[in-house]
Curated annotation (Swiss-Prot):
InterPro entries: CheD-like_sf, Chemorcpt_Glu_NH3ase_CheD, Cytotoxic_necrot_fac-like_cat. This is Probable chemoreceptor glutamine deamidase CheD. Coiled coil: none annotated. Gene3D superfamilies: 3.30.1330.200. Belongs to the CheD family. Its EC number is 3.5.1.44. Keywords: Chemotaxis, Hydrolase. It comes from the Bacteria. The gene is cheD. It catalyses: L-glutaminyl-[protein] + H2O = L-glutamyl-[protein] + NH4(+). It comes from Geobacillus kaustophilus (strain HTA426). GO terms for biological process: chemotaxis.
């Protein structure tokens, strides 16, 4: 009997797992699922990022997992605290869809999915963490699950077969 658990994270949450546990999130539309992992230690973290910049926050307390500019570094720290090695970390991304069609009204502000992906990649580059695989953009929502033992990110998109990256 397996003792593996599937840890589920919601919107604007992040968590870390160690194999044999897996981690998953659903409802990735314009949000981005960021996975940072150390394959050699079989440890991984996932964040469900909702918005690109913490400057969009209202009020005094910022939920680091909600924003791309704060979630990536916070997730790296959690993975390292769980045994990940800074120089061995890699990233996989999914999400960042354009879920609705907008006219030119709003312009760049309405491209939340693309802006989320851009900011996540910017933060990963700043921290020297390579993106080794991604499934981003498009117009469909996604559910993802990462297995730190195999390093496989499984992606389920509406009306499509499960993709593994």
């Amino acid at each position: 009997m397996s003792t593996a658990q599937a840890v589920k994270i919601g919107i604007a949450e992040m968590e870390v797992v160690i194999a044999p546990n897996v981690i998953r999130t659903c409802g990735l539309g314009s949000c981005v699922g960021v996975v940072i992992y150390d394959a050699g230690k079989a440890v991984a973290g996932m964040a469900h990022v909702m918005l690109p910049h913490s400057s969009m926050a209202r009020g005094g307390v910022i939920n680091a997992a909600k924003y791309a500019d704060t979630a990536v570094e916070a997730l790296v720290q959690l993975v390292i605290a769980a045994g990940g090695r800074k120089g061995m970390l890699k990233a996989k991304l999914a999400g960042g869809a354009q879920m609705f069609s907008f006219s030119t009204v709003g312009g760049d502000m309405m491209r939340i999915g693309a802006r989320n992906v851009e900011e996540v990649k910017k933060q990963l580059e700043r921290l020297h963490i390579p993106v080794v695989a991604e499934d981003v953009g498009g117009h469909s929502g996604r559910t993802i699950e990462f297995n730190p033992q195999t390093g496989v990110l499984s992606i389920r998109t509406a009306a499509q077969e499960i993709k593994e990256i």
